[in-house]
From Swiss-Prot:
Protein name per its UniProtKB record: Sugar fermentation stimulation protein homolog
CDD domains assigned to the protein according to its UniProt record, in alphabetical order: SfsA-like_bacterial (cd22359)
UniProt cross-references to HAMAP family, sorted A to Z: SfsA (MF_00095)
Family according to the record: Belongs to the SfsA family.
InterPro entries to which the protein is assigned, alphabetical: SfsA (IPR005224), SfsA_C (IPR040452), SfsA_N (IPR041465)
Pfam (any one): SfsA
GO MF: DNA binding
């Protein structure tokens, strides 16, 4: 995925009320940017970090700027969680996810339980096989290069695991939790048990019930983000 415009560099002054970020652009202008990330952004919200923002051309938007990338020194990090589904769909369609080859159709935001929609539904009409893919954007790096999720307690994330596990009811029906690590400096993926032990327990239970776990790293630059390679899973 290439950004459709040139990103503007700046310095993060503060992130507050979850969805707002004060940024000093390199031009000297101070702006308020939308922060499209509901997590804690642990390690990525400290004042003084370098950032990149995009500017919308829509005059009706209350905030013209959106926080896109944070410079974590060892890697640029994509913090726009809304881009995770786009990146994953693009990678699947391009055949870069070896474990998800062979599906002719990809649909987004398909209802699959009473109160949930799946991020991506892969289908092969010729064999009637399908694969439910829930995508999580991972930005937290800990310890010796572990990509960790979640970065804050998430009851919603635990519910998604329960919903996924409930779909594994036929050999023709797969369920995949896909962790998209939007940074380049991680060696493996592991659940963040120190932050949300309940989520880690739910993840291990879902695996026992047939849910598959995939984690992929990204190459991140101010020009765009590309899904690159599979990461080992440490449970």
């Amino acid at each position: 995925m290439s950004f459709d415009q040139i990103l503007l560099p700046g310095i993060l002054r503060r992130r507050y009320q979850r969805f707002f970020a004060d940024v000093a652009l390199e031009t000297g202008e101070s702006i308020v940017a939308h922060c499209p990330n509901t997590g804690s952004m642990r390690g990525l919200a400290e004042p003084g970090l370098g950032v990149y923002v995009s500017r919308a051309n829509n005059p009706r938007r209350k905030l013209a700027y959106t926080l896109e990338l944070v410079d974590a020194h060892t890697s640029l990090v994509g913090v726009h969680t809304g881009r995770a589904n786009i990146l994953t769909k693009e990678a699947i369609a391009a055949g870069r996810i070896s474990q998800l080859l062979g599906y002719g159709e990809i649909r987004q935001e398909v209802r699959y339980s009473k109160n949930s929609r799946i991020d991506l539904l892969l289908e092969d009409p010729s064999t009637q096989q399908c694969c439910y893919v829930e995508v999580k954007s991972v930005t937290l790096r800990q310890g010796d290069g572990a990509a960790c999720f979640p970065d804050a307690v998430t009851t919603r994330g635990a519910k998604h695991l329960d919903d996924l596990a409930a779909t594994v009811c036929s050999p023709r029906q797969r369920a995949v939790m896909f962790y998209l690590v939007q940074r380049e400096d991680c060696r493996y993926f592991t659940p963040a048990d120190d932050i949300d032990p309940r989520y880690g327990a739910k993840l291990r239970s879902a695996i026992e019930q047939g849910v598959e776990i995939l984690a992929y790293a990204c190459q991140v630059s101010s020009q765009g983000i590309q899904v690159t390679q599979s990461l080992p899973i440490h449970l």
